[in-house]
């Protein structure tokens, strides 16, 4: 019995070796091809009914989001361009107003300066005329004083030298000398 068990075990072992890999055994190929086709059809239906619609929905949503974002960006760009244009116009208007205010202020200051200069010139002219008249008075007074001192000195010199002083001749001599 031991021999029979050994032989049966040996035959089973040799039978397994004779068969080889079941994937390469042509006896099993129709069954393997059937299950391959069933698996591929199942994967195809799973992809077409579940996965691809979800992927398509996600892609469509992304495309819509991108399109909306691009449209919003374009709209914001247009608004930014309009805002920049309005800003530049307001800035130009403000500059023009500032230049006008500067021109008005400059004109007012020039007018005030002209009035003040004219007033100062008038005051200076009046003081200058007054000073000229004073100088003329002082000069006339000094000339009169010099003439009198010269007459007195001439009379004193003539008297000191022992001569007779004639007032008319002294006046004529002093007047001739004063003229030049």
From Swiss-Prot:
Assembly: F-type ATPases have 2 components, F(1) - the catalytic core - and F(0) - the membrane proton channel. F(1) has five subunits: alpha(3), beta(3), gamma(1), delta(1), epsilon(1). F(0) has three main subunits: a(1), b(2) and c(10-14). The alpha and beta chains form an alternating ring which encloses part of the gamma chain. F(1) is attached to F(0) by a central stalk formed by the gamma and epsilon chains, while a peripheral stalk is formed by the delta and b chains.
Bilayer disposition of the protein: Single-pass membrane protein
A molecular function GO annotation: proton-transporting ATP synthase activity, rotational mechanism
CDD domains referenced in this protein's UniProt entry, alphabetically: ATP-synt_Fo_b
GO cellular component terms, A-Z: plasma membrane; proton-transporting ATP synthase complex
Keywords assigned: ATP synthesis, Cell inner membrane, Cell membrane, CF(0), Hydrogen ion transport, Ion transport, Membrane, Transmembrane, Transmembrane helix, Transport
Protein's UniProt keywords contain Cell membrane: yes
Species whose genome carries this gene: Cereibacter sphaeroides (strain ATCC 17025 / ATH 2.4.3) (Rhodobacter sphaeroides)
Compartment(s) of residence: Cell inner membrane
Record gene name: atpF2
Major subcellular location class: membrane
Protein name: ATP synthase subunit b 2
Function in brief: F(1)F(0) ATP synthase produces ATP from ADP in the presence of a proton or sodium gradient. F-type ATPases consist of two structural domains, F(1) containing the extramembraneous catalytic core and F(0) containing the membrane proton channel, linked together by a central stalk and a peripheral stalk. During catalysis, ATP synthesis in the catalytic domain of F(1) is coupled via a rotary mechanism of the central stalk subunits to proton translocation.
Disulfide bridge map: none
Source taxon at top rank: Bacteria
Family in the record: Belongs to the ATPase B chain family.
Transmembrane segments: 33-53
